[in-house]
Every structure is written in structure tokens, then in C-alpha cells.
């Protein structure tokens, strides 16, 4: 076998692919990354992901493998488990953890598989109101998420005027629906969740309470927002958003006494084996050991003072972003933010999510279109979601966010000019840009400003790619 095939660098072995990767690196460096679920991970995490650990199969749990040669893989996974507990200040006699899920969606589905019977009942925040697909989303005509296909799901919602979760209505619906599991989690909700109230509702209906803290797990680790662990039976998370680790998932589960009966008999948690067996062999095969190592080093970073200061700055930047946009006439769902993201309602200025996302993208500001409270269709959303984790990782602070607000405002104003010609349909919007030299020029000029500004901030990772 040719040693060259095995030992060449990517840029030598596959320059076509490498050139595309370099273009993506340049895009990340030159643009303002404001997708709330994205971040720039550290060099140690990237080194784990590209290490020899990629080569090893290790089905099963540490010291209970179906393959030989896992002595050091076991050490790494146990280290990742211990550090995950330490990052959230958890006692091993009270909490267990599984670090094998490939990402957040598999982690959530493993919980459902383990503790909810087929066609059992689940409640989660509705997707148009800020929930996640895996929390059971369906429409009047179609079950969209596998959660809604294999389980019976019932959404709870926000108040359409305030944008805040209607806990009273949630309690009322839960009393009628009697879910096996209630999910306290979100993908686009800018306020801290009331885990105590969730716990009360779950207890009133004999339900398990699961927090999906994928978006805010870094903030929780840093102690800058309330923790779900005091009140929840299960906590799931991704590790690549505010936690700034690899693309992976983690499941925390309670151990020990769950409750005490009137006669004094203790009722014990039985989550550990159910969840572990749901992950493997229920849903997955061999775990991704390179990702588990990356979880271990990311969790170590999460216990540092530097990480805590970073998370504080993420929130400061998000709040400054809201203040700046409000001062320029934009509406923010819930009136502001407690976390890392802002949901901008564009109905008041005559825009929609899709054209807003597109014009910002053309100006090198990356975000995503998003439903806002009161939207009827998830296919035609009225807002955009903006996040500060990635910008904060690059070193932006409040004064820099003021500049970012200016860029966003100017891009959206260009979008409004285009809409006057094209209307709100995205295909017509794009066509108007292509056919109008003045629109093109305005976009190109703003893009150049944005990219020159963005390039002045460092980008973590490898220099070349």
C-alpha cells in the first residue's frame, strides 16, 4: 500500500476539497457569525477531534465493552463523565451521566426511548413558540419530528402578546393530557426558564421533568443563569453551542431516592440502565471516541475563571444587542433577553424572516429566519434569531456590538428598499437584487465594511483551515 495515500496532507491529497474548506474558513473569518446555536471551538477540542481516537471501536460502557483494546478509551470516557459532573457541580452519588450520544437530537430521543413507552405522552414547547423539533413538533397535516411519530406529543405555548411561556395554561393542559415526560427546553426563547414551576407541574401529574439545556449549557456551567439540576430528573445538552465544545450530546440522569411514600418506603430512581441501554444498543452503535475526548477537554475549560467571564460577556453582548435594536425601532420578543440570543420581530417594520436573513447573509452577517409569537406558519416566519456566543468568542464587547447593530440596521434598511420593488417573496427578492445594479452596489459596499471589521478580530482554531 502506498504510504503517500495514507500520509499526505489534505491540501496535497485532495486540493479540490481543501480549497472549499479554506473558502469556508475565510467566510468564518470575514463574516459576523450570529447564528445562536453556533460557536468557534478551541484548538484542544479540534486536536481531540482529529486524533487517533477516531480509529477505535468501543461499543458498550467503560469496563463493559464488546471489543478488546479499550483500556485507554475507558480512561478517556470515565474522565469525560467525571468532568461533566464537575462542570455542573454534581455529586456522583446523586447524578449519572452518559457522554456517548452523537449529538443533542439523539440524546433527547434516547431519553424518550428509555423512559416513555411507545405512544407514551410528551409535552414540549411548541416549535413556532421557541421549542425544538425533537420536543414533538407536528402540524395539522403532518407529524414532522420522529418524536411526534413514535410518541404522542402535546405542545405548550407562549402568550402571543408577551412572548413568555404561559405556565398556567401549561399546568391546565398537563392536567388533561397527563404526560409521562415534560420537557423544559428551547431553541429560541430568550428568558430563563422557571424550573421550579415546571417541577410543580410535573409532580402534580406524576411526570418526569427533563431539561434540554442545549442552548444555555455554557451559561449554566458558568453559574450566570439558574441551573435546571435542582429541579429536574434528567438534563440533556449538546456540547457545541455556548459550551463551546465538539458536536456531541450528553445526558445527565438522577440516581438514588426519587420520592418517599406515605408509609416511609423509598422509591428509587431507575433511570440509569434505561437511558444507557437506550443509547446503546437501542439507538447507536460504537461511540465517537474522538468526540468524547473533546467533551472531556471542553468540560475542563468550563470550570475556568476565563470561561465564566466569557459567559458573562455573552449575556452582556446579547442585552446590548437588544437595547441597540430596540433604540432603532425594532421589536424584540419578550422585550429583551436573559441569555445568549434575541428574537427580532420584523412585522412592525414591514419585513419578513426569509428576505431579512438573505440580505444579511449577502452583507456577511449570518443569522437565521425564525418564527415569532403569533406566527401562523413556520414556513413563512416573521422574525430572525440573533446570537452572541460566536462573536463573544472572537473578543467582541459592548462597544463592538453597537457597531454590529449598525451593520444589521443598515442591511435591513436595504432589504426594505428591495421589498418595495420585489414584494416579500424570497424568489422575487433575489431576482430584484440580481437585476438592480444599485441594490447590488449598496450590498457590496456594506459587505466590504462588515468584512474589514470582522477580520480585525481573531478567529480560534487552525490557521489554514
From Swiss-Prot:
Reaction catalysis annotation: (6R)-5,10-methylene-5,6,7,8-tetrahydrofolate + glycine + H2O = (6S)-5,6,7,8-tetrahydrofolate + L-serine
Biochemical pathway: One-carbon metabolism; tetrahydrofolate interconversion
Keyword Transferase: yes
Organism expressing this protein natively: Bombyx mori
Assigned EC number: 2.1.2.1
Family: Belongs to the SHMT family.
Temperature dependence: Optimum temperature is 30 degrees Celsius.
Molecular function as annotated in GO: glycine hydroxymethyltransferase activity; methyltransferase activity; pyridoxal phosphate binding
InterPro entries noted in UniProt: PyrdxlP-dep_Trfase, PyrdxlP-dep_Trfase_major, PyrdxlP-dep_Trfase_small, Ser_HO-MeTrfase, Ser_HO-MeTrfase-like, Ser_HO-MeTrfase_PLP_BS, SHMT-like_dom
CDD domains: SHMT (cd00378)
Residue positions where N6-(pyridoxal phosphate)lysine is found in the record: 241
GO CC aspect terms: mitochondrion; nucleus
Protein name: Serine hydroxymethyltransferase
